[in-house]
């Protein structure tokens, strides 16, 4: 069985072949720590915007550099990647170690770049790269009340 979780170099090579065949490549990224229904709906919506959905996942060190919380991520990077790869709407998963996915987006050159509705379009990392080659940037509304931070707060409040 071929894995969907690939090193960057291998993924970029595969995507070059797909692009040559006219495949529309969609890219999104995130930490995806403690997956919830908001994540799955977001990823399903992203997939509907093209043929292949590539998900960039922050490594553990990258998540810690974002200063979400000192104890994040809860779930290790290899497990977060495997959970994402198990979803039917996700075609490929790739880890990235930088605080933002700018270099990865430049290498992948997606046709569609997708982020959650909590991102202002002009602040989306990689927007300039995608639009410069004729691609589009889209945002997807968040599921109200659903976030990993809210989920963690709820868990912590019930264990006190």
Regions found by a protein language model. Give the residues of each.
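Nucleotidyltransferase catalytic core that binds NTPs
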Residues: 1-160
């Amino acid at each position: 069985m071929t894995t969907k979780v690939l090193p960057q170099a291998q993924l970029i090579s595969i995507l070059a072949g797909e692009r040559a065949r006219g495949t529309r490549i969609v890219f999104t990224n995130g930490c995806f720590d403690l997956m919830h229904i908001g994540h799955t709906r977001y990823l399903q919506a992203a997939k509907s915007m093209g043929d292949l959905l590539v998900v960039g996942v922050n490594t553990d060190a990258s998540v810690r550099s974002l200063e979400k919380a000192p104890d994040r991520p809860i779930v290790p990077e290899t497990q977060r990647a495997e959970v994402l790869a198990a979803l039917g709407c996700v075609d490929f998963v790739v880890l990235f170690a930088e605080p933002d996915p700018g270099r990865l987006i430049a290498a992948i050159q997606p046709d569609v770049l997708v982020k959650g509705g909590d991102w202002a379009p002009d602040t989306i990392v990689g927007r300039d790269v995608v639009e410069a080659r004729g691609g589009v940037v889209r945002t997807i509304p968040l599921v109200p009340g659903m976030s990993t931070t809210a989920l963690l707060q709820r868990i912590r409040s019930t264990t006190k």
